[in-house]
Amino acid sequence: MDVAPNWYLALSAVLFTIGTFGVLFRRNAIVVLMSVELMLNAVNLTLVTFSQSMGDPSGQLLVFFSIAVAAAEAAVGLAIVIAIFRSQVTVDITEINLFKH
């Protein structure tokens, strides 16, 4: 059973939209970081879909590098959130003021 590429692209658009709303409307820094990761995975799904439909594996290779960069970004982002939490005792983006000290 083959699934049409349009379904994958629709799923990617839904995931990207959910991630965008998470970045725009959430205040928790960890949830915002997770929303950015969701957006990156939506882009990866789009790359794999177009790569598969065109028959060119270079898009899938680009996704492997993108996953590695996303993992590093998540690790650095989480480390920054933990450091801010230790100094500010909050992960609420509206309450964090790094220029205060």
Swiss-Prot record:
Cited InterPro entries: NADH_UbQ_OxRdtase_chain4L/K, NUOK/Mnh_C1-like
Under which main EC class is this enzyme filed?
Answer: translocase
- Disulfide bonds listed in the record: none
Residue ranges of the TM segments: 5-25, 30-50, 62-82
**Gene Ontology molecular function terms on file:** NADH:ubiquinone reductase (non-electrogenic) activity; quinone binding
Tell me where it resides.
Answer: Cell inner membrane
Q: How does it sit in the membrane?
A: Multi-pass membrane protein
Q: Keyword set for this entry?
A: Cell inner membrane, Cell membrane, Membrane, NAD, Quinone, Translocase, Transmembrane, Transmembrane helix, Transport
Q: Which GO terms describe its cellular component?
A: NADH dehydrogenase complex; plasma membrane
Q: Known EC number(s)?
A: 7.1.1.-
User: What is an annotated GO biological process for this record, any one?
Assistant: ATP synthesis coupled electron transport
Matching Pfam families: Oxidored_q2
Gene3D superfamilies the UniProt entry points to: 1.10.287.3510
Query: Which reaction is catalysed here?
Result: a quinone + NADH + 5 H(+)(in) = a quinol + NAD(+) + 4 H(+)(out)
Major place of residence: membrane
- Tell me which family the UniProt entry assigns to this protein: Belongs to the complex I subunit 4L family.
Known role = NDH-1 shuttles electrons from NADH, via FMN and iron-sulfur (Fe-S) centers, to quinones in the respiratory chain. The immediate electron acceptor for the enzyme in this species is believed to be a menaquinone. Couples the redox reaction to proton translocation (for every two electrons transferred, four hydrogen ions are translocated across the cytoplasmic membrane), and thus conserves the redox energy in a proton gradient.
Query: Cross-referenced PANTHER family, in alphabetical order?
Result: NADH DEHYDROGENASE SUBUNIT 4L-RELATED, NADH-UBIQUINONE OXIDOREDUCTASE SUBUNIT ND4L
The record ties this protein, via HAMAP family, to: NDH1_NuoK (MF_01456)
State how it assembles.
NDH-1 is composed of 14 different subunits. Subunits NuoA, H, J, K, L, M, N constitute the membrane sector of the complex.
The protein's name in its UniProt record: NADH-quinone oxidoreductase subunit K
What species does this protein belong to?
Answer: Salinibacter ruber (strain DSM 13855 / M31)
What phylogenetic lineage does the species belong to? Bacteria, Pseudomonadati, Rhodothermota, Rhodothermia, Rhodothermales
